[in-house]
Design a protein with these regions (language model features):
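RecA-like P-loop NTPase motor core
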Residues: 327-328, 341-344, 348-457
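Short glycine-/polar-rich loops that comprise or flank the Walker A/P-loop
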Residues: 74-79, 102-106, 138-142, 298, ...
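Flexible phosphate/Mg2+-sensing switch loops adjacent to catalytic phosphate-binding sites
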Residues: 49-75, 285-296, 328-329, 334, ...
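Extended helical coiled-coil dimerization/tether regions that scaffold
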Residues: 151-158, 164-303
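Switch/communication elements of ASCE P-loop NTPase nucleotide-binding domains
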Residues: 1-49, 249-387
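Electropositive, glycine-dotted interaction segments
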Residues: 78, 84-189, 428
Length: 458
């Protein structure tokens, strides 16, 4: 099961009906700034409850507002998702979402009015446009990682600790068994035993410190008003115990003493981001092996700019692992990026190109109709430098290095009379792409379909 198509209207940059087709497994969304990549991610988040941050609240800025003088903000927006490749269990679970054409779809309609304190949300599906049951929606797990991630905060101890969430998933089966038996989980029993030893043993001075506090309290307010005190490491409850745990790091995998591990606030931003993402992927791998509706039937992982704080080698390794995770677990992974490293590290069919416009245009490169020979050539040809063609506003394909150097200089002469900021190809967002040969035919159909560019081939 995966989301094969998303349709948006009236939401952010999407003033008119906009449709993007997505891949089963990994989708990498590329394009220039302001092309609508974040808008697609935000539209998906409107449909589901984010397991990291909860429901994505509707904001006034979510309603489209054009830039022309006199444009008014949209009074409503619509988001629809189409699901494909459902197995039998998924078909049964989401049967109520089938429309008259037997397509499984989820629809959201949000309206705003000046007299309303907050927008009205209508989430519906199926032939009868019935309201979606929360229990059914909870079968879809959505995890969103924003571009500016505070990985250290997410990995710190506390009620929202990512480490605690992972441990609860790992121990879920055992916790249910001990709850039915009326017994303590081994971790809880061990902590209780340790806390009892601390409180009662004279060797640690804990007992003495607690007695001093208790005596001072009784002297201050009297025995009839005083409260009992006890010094221990944690409350004897599984959730509280795992929420108090801290994740530490050491810079390599060599065998070291535990005292050499350090707090994550001493680690690099890039590695903290990797540890955070690794904890999420570990949970997804684990849940994929537990055929339990409580773990969700479908998982959606949305990551904006996974390249944040990572050098090129780590970017490539991370994206490969994301692709492997999608294939092994059935998780649908949707990534947005401005990294030519990531864009060149995936096959062409995984890429969706976004072009700025009113509305933006999304092109799934797998549907550009390239012959197999051309597709194989483009996949081999794209590298970190040449994948710039996926992000440029305009393109100039040239045969060799001489043209790549000469044409931008000629453009400066032609454009010198233009206002400042429009006097070079770079100013205009145009890239000269050196093909190192006369391979134009492999690229013209790709670019014509995705960006409708004019072209000249000698």
């Amino acid at each position: 099961m995966y989301i094969s198509e998303l349709t948006v209207e009236g939401f952010r940059a999407f003033n008119q009906p906009f449709t993007v087709k997505l891949n089963k497994g990994l989708t990498v969304m590329v394009g220039e700034n302001g092309a609508g990549k974040t808008g697609v991610i935000s539209a998906l988040r409107q449909l589901f409850v984010d397991s990291e941050a909860g429901r994505y609240a509707v904001d006034d800025q979510d309603f489209h507002l054009g830039f022309a003088v006199g444009d008014a903000r949209a009074q409503s927006f619509k988001v629809s998702a189409t699901f494909s490749a459902l197995d039998m269990a998924e078909k049964l679970a989401f049967m109520a979402w089938e429309d008259i054409d037997h397509n499984t779809k989820l629809h959201l309609h949000v309206e705003t009015r000046e007299y309303r304190a907050r927008p009205k949300r209508s989430l519906w599906a199926g032939k009868t446009k019935a309201t979606v049951e929360p229990e059914v929606l909870d079968l879809i797990r959505c995890i969103y990682l924003p571009p500016l991630r505070d990985a250290e905060e997410k990995l710190s101890n506390g009620s929202r600790s990512r480490l605690a969430k992972l441990l609860k998933v790992i121990c879920k089966k055992d916790l249910l068994k001990h709850e039915d038996d009326g017994t303590d989980h081994p971790l809880v029993a061990k902590v209780k035993e340790f806390n009892k030893e601390l409180a009662e043993c004279d060797d640690y001075e804990i007992k003495k410190a607690n007695a001093l506090i208790s005596d001072s309290l009784k002297k201050a307010i009297g025995e009839s008003l005083a409260q009992g005190t006890r010094i221990q490491f944690s409350e004897s409850d599984f959730s509280r115990i795992v929420e108090s745990l801290r994740l530490l790091y050491f810079p390599d995998l060599s065998a070291v003493d535990t005292s050499q591990f350090r707090s994550l606030n001493e680690n690099s931003l890039g590695y903290n981001n990797l540890i955070y993402i690794a904890s999420i992927l570990a949970e997804l791998h684990l849940e994929s092996k537990l055929p339990d509706q409580d773990n969700g039937l479908f998982h959606l992982l949305l990551i904006e700019e996974p390249e944040a704080h990572l050098h090129p080698q780590l970017q490539t390794r991370l994206l490969k692992y994301l692709a492997d995770t999608a294939q092994e677990t059935g998780v649908q992974v949707i990534v947005t990026t401005h990294s030519t490293v990531l864009a060149s590290a995936v096959p062409m069919h995984a890429i969706v190109h976004m072009t700025a416009g009113a509305p933006p245009v999304a092109t799934r490169l797998a549907e550009c109709g390239l012959p197999d020979k051309s597709e194989r050539f483009v996949n081999r040809w794209l590298d970190v430098t040449k994948s710039n063609l996926l992000f440029a506003r305009g393109l100039m394909f040239v045969e060799g290095i001489a043209e790549a150097i000469l044409l931008p200089e000629l453009a400066k002469l032609v454009l010198k009379a233009q206002p400042i900021g429009k006097q070079t190809l770079h100013d205009l967002g145009v890239s000269a792409i050196n093909l190192n040969g006369i391979y134009f035919k492999h690229f013209m159909q790709l670019r014509n379909v995705s960006m409708n560019l004019k072209h000249l081939v000698e």
